[in-house]
Amino acid sequence: MEGIFECEFVKVGCGRDEIANMTGQKTYDVAVVGAGVFGAWTAWHLAKGGQRVALVEAYAPGHSRASSGGETRIIRMGYGADELYTRWSQRSLVQWRDFLGAVKQPLFLQTGVLWMAGKDHARLEATVATLKRCGVEFVEHDRASLEKRYPQIALEEIQKGIFEPQSGVLLARRAVAAVVEDAVRRGVEYRSAQATNPREAGRVEHIVTSQGERIAAGQFVFACGAWLGKIFPDVLGARIFPSRQEVFFFGIPPGETRFAPPGLPTWLFQEDLVYGMPDIEGRGLKIAFDEHGERVDPDTQSRIVSPEMTKAVRAYVARRFPALGDAPIVETRVCQYENTSSGDFLIDRHPEMENVWFAGGGSGHGFKHGPAVAEYLAGQLLEGRKPEPRFSLETKETTQKRTVY
């Protein structure tokens, strides 16, 4: 058995309604496979629009092996000169806040997001220009301002910063679960299931789960994260790059408040490709390197942090946050990014299966965009809207040339 989701595709000559009448099985408008942030929001959005939706997940929404798992994710507007993702972040933040307010779950924390850069601050300047064009609120900091506002950070080569006060942190695992729960309230039928890999081209009429259930639908969306390349090896095996990413939490000294909000926001050091979050819910200072780790199999990779990365992260924390130089590591996680060659999302139709769609390639920055991905995909599925070329399968190469950060 390969991958978390394995789906057997069946191509037949009869139409959906004829099959349903003959077999008595229910036919959905859309079946979504994968209940991570892309799949959950897609199912929710389609159901809100009146579609009959099945949502299939082998483990649980936001499970520990998923790219959408874990406790926290950043939602930020800054993307250098890339206006597309800045505007998608804006739209998604509005929808996250509206949704979480409606379901009365405080799973967005407005910590603010602080970007910092040294001598090479061209990307920071490009971010400022884009935020201005998009009407995003931000505050610029020079070196003196950063030193005064954040004395707990050893700035060293850092010269400039920008602060996004409206941005912050989503409590990821719980947020995905909340979206799925509300989707079910809206009529989505949830299945915990596996199946076999696709075998036939053409129009897919139904998938067969490992429990023997046939799920018939007019269209199928595969939002399976790091498993997309295993489910569709011929098409995506060389174009989806699951990478090992190690995350660390450092304990905060007793009575210390400088490392929790509002004393410390969510933060990113541009040249170092390091990001982190303040002490949230007593978990400690979160830190991770944003460089892509080694390529891994999401089913078999070790979930234990390496001695080499542990040493590197300890050294970095001691340098940037001297007060935490002797702080204990209180928690670790090994997850994965699900990268495309450029870092752009993959939202496109299967080249040989006319009613099968891919939704993936989150590339380490996708979680925040769940609502916007769902809106875009619904427009493709239901209205045939003009596609964004950057999301096409055609643009996904077999070697990594990252351009989106």
Residue ranges and their predicted role:
Residues 39-40:
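N-terminal Rossmann-fold NAD(P) dinucleotide-binding loop
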